[in-house]
Amino acid sequence: LTAFWESDRDKAVAFSRDIVERIRASKTASPAARLPDDRKLVMRLIEQAFSLADELQGGFGDQNKFPMSPQLHVLLKLQQREPSPGLHDFLVLTLDQMAGKGLRDQLAGGFFRYTIDPGWETPHYEKMLYNQAQLASLYLFAADVLNRPDYRVVAMDTLDFVLERMRGENGGYISSLSALDEAGVEGGSYLWSRERLASTLSEEELEVALAMWEFPFGTQLPGLALPFAREGESVDPELAEAVRLKLLAERAQRVPPRDTKQLAAWNGLLLKAFAQAAVAFNDEGYAEAAEALARWCLSMWDGRRLSRSNGQAGDASLADYLYVADGLRAWAEVSRQKQYSQTADELIARSWQLFFDDRGWRLGERQLIPGLDGEPAMQDGPMPAPSALAIALGTREQREKALRLGAEAVTGDPFWFASHAWQLFEHEQHAERTDGANEK
C-alpha cells in the first residue's frame, strides 16, 4: 500500500474513493414502508437458529463453541412467550453443557470465553467480565423460564466469582483474567495432574473429588485435566466444600494475570446483573455491590460525555452509553433512587444524538473511514447489539424510525440480528394490544 501511494497517489485516492462508495452502497437502506410480520419473523429466527444448532451437544456451530448469550436470551424470551417442547429441550441441553463442562470453572465459578471444540470440553481460558455479567443474567432468567432452580446456583456462583476475583480499584470491575499463567502456559492456572491432585488431597478427599468431578486427563494437555461436573453423585456437602476450598487454596498459587482496565460498557452489563440478583435472591450483598457500581458509573458521566474507561483516554461508544444506561435504569427500579434513572435518561438521549441519524447507527462518534454511512441495524456479537438496546430504551417515535430503517437487514438474517428481531416483535405485539384495546 505504501508503494502504491508513493508511486501513483492520484490512482490510490481514486481507488480508495471507489471502495468507500461500494461499501456505502452495500450498507445503504431505505426505511421500510411498513414493518414486517412479527409472527413470520419469529418463525424465521427459530428456523435459522435450529439450522445452526448442534442438537446433540448444544450451542451453535460445529467447531468452536461460544456462549452466544444475546441469541440464547432472545430464544428464552420466545420460549417464555410461546412455549415449545423442541426449543425447551435445546435450551436445557445447551445451558447444561455450558454449566457442566469445560466452559465453566467448576471450582471457583465463572465462565471462560469459549471452547475450541464442539463438545464444550477445552476452553480458551480467558475470563471476560462481559461473559460473567451476561451469563449470570441468562441463568437467572433461564431458572424461571425453564423451571430449573439449579440455574440460580450457577448465576450466584458466577457473580460471587466476580466479586471475589474481578474487583478493581475505585469501584469498577476489571476487564479480564488472562488465559495464560505466569509461566505462559495456557490454562496453567486451572489444569490438574494426577500427581498434583494426590499431593494436595488426602485419600478420602481424593475420593470425594473424583465423585464430584470428572477429570478427563490428557484431553487438555498431556497428563492434565480440567474438572467437569459429575451428575448423580451424592456427596456430603460439608466435606465437598472442604475439598473444593482445599483445591482452590492450591490453585491460588497459580493465579492468572489480570487486565485491570475498567470499561464502562462491561460494568454496565454487570450492574444490571447485580440488580437482578439483588431481587432474585433478596440479597443485601448484591444490593451493596450494585449500589457501589452504580456510583462508579455516575462518576464516568460529566453531563455531556461518558468516559469509556476509568483513568484512560478514548471516546465512549454507543455500547458504553447504552449498557451503562440500561444498568443504571435496572438498579433505579430496584433502589428507587431518582439520580440513577435521571442519569440513565440523559445517557439514552445523548446516545441518540451522537450515534444515530437518517443514515443509521454508528458505533463510535468518529468513523474509522470518513464518508461511510451508518448501519441500518447492528448485529449481535458477544454482547447484544447496542442499537437494539437503544430502540428498547428510546421513545416510541425513535423506535418506529429505527425499526423501519433496519427492517430489511433484520428480516433477512434474524438470528444474527436477534436482539433487533425481538424489538420488532415487541413493537408489533404492543401495537396489536393497543389496537385491540382501542377497539373495545
Question: Would you name each region that the model predicts?
Answer:
Residues Q97-R104, A292-M300:
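Glycine-rich, acidic and aromatic/proline-enriched surface loops and short helix-turn segments
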Residues E82, R148, Q276-E288, E333-Q342:
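Acidic, serine/threonine/proline-rich low-complexity intrinsically disordered regions
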Residues Y114-T115, A278-F281, G285-Y286, D302-Q312:
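Glycine-rich cofactor-pocket loops
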Residues L1-A273, A277-A280, R404-K440:
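Replace the tail clause
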Residues E164-R167, S299-L322, R329-K440:
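Long, polar/charge-rich, low-hydrophobicity segments
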Residues L135, A273, V324-G327, A390:
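Active-site-proximal alpha-helical segments within enzyme catalytic domains
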